[in-house]
Amino acid sequence: MKNLLKAMILKSLIKSQKLAEKCDSVFSLKCQLNINMDLCNPNQKRVLFSYLDIRKYEPKNTVHANFQQAVQMLKCLIDMGYCVDICYLNDEITIKYVLNRNKEYDIILGHGDLYKQACKLECNKKALKILFVTENFPLVVEKKYAERAEYLKQRHPKLDFSCSPVRSGYFDEEIFTVSDYAVIMSSLYNIEPMKAYVKKTYQINSNIIFNKDFHFDKAARLNSIKEYKKNFLWFGSFGLVHKGVDILLDTFKELPDYKIAFYGLAPSEKSIFEEMKSSNTKDCGRINVQTEDFIEKVVNKHCFMIMPSCSEGMNTSVATCMAHGIIPIVTKETGFEPCKYIIELEDYKIETVIECINKVLSMSEEEILAMSEGACKYAQENFCLTHFDNSFRKIMKQIMHSADE
């Protein structure tokens, strides 16, 4: 019934703009138009910002760092004097409502279906098209996920993991071909395949969600290291196979003296976890980074987090854990530049992960403390929201200058 109603609405929207506007009041379309409109400036430039629906965003309950990004990107566009339409990137009804207006934009920024369709409209032929990339290149994602799926099949030929699909949907190859520039939240290694599709790429760091009650206390951290250094952490979201949870479950079966806690598993994928888990692996549900529980249960009781993902942009959960003193162990594809406070796995194989775990646990408590403090300072400096904001503003100015040449 829900899909039938949705299809009827979509069909009606194409025929009637007035009906579309009525739908806005009934269904609350995921967009906000004409932000920062200046009626005294007939030459004001217009931007379509295709990203997230931030109308009900509450800073104290940030579920993902990308909401903070969207707010600051919008603030930058306002400060640059643009009139902005900000819309959710993949909502079909919103897309029809916005694009049927045939509004001409000077800049189209973001990603998703709305971005791609708007870029292809004749009325936006002259618009500057800036792709904001938060994932790895889609062809690479498909290849890397296929490798992981095959590796899992080799180890568990009878396991049904169809409920854990490849993480995709916002990006495909075509979205790069319709873009002029790309602002990419990833490592230079991950950015390389994307360079051939656009005039120029710009690298930007991800931002963290930070718990304001946290401060790095050396004495307290050393006590945590002494008591909990054999406790490991996976901190993520949906995409169990994509993000290497299956590899960690099999790894810790071989390491019965160590423990690993999993935060953020998707409910739809927990059947796989239940089938593969062992006594030293625990599903801890989800947790709000900005709460006291996060400090008590996650920060104070873990020294290392492991993210053996097959493909990422620049993983925000890794950056967030670093900013709270947790040392990351990651694959190269997780999207970070080489750094002495980030431990990079040579590959994703179980024996490699085991070797790395044993190696880090051979470090002295003082060495772990120094690395924990270094990771904390590095992340707070390089992955803070202010750093993201400053970088985005600088990039936008560079793009405008390049476009004017």
Give the residues covered by each predicted segment:
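Short hydrophobic beta-strand element within catalytic cores of glycosyltransferases
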Residues: 326-330
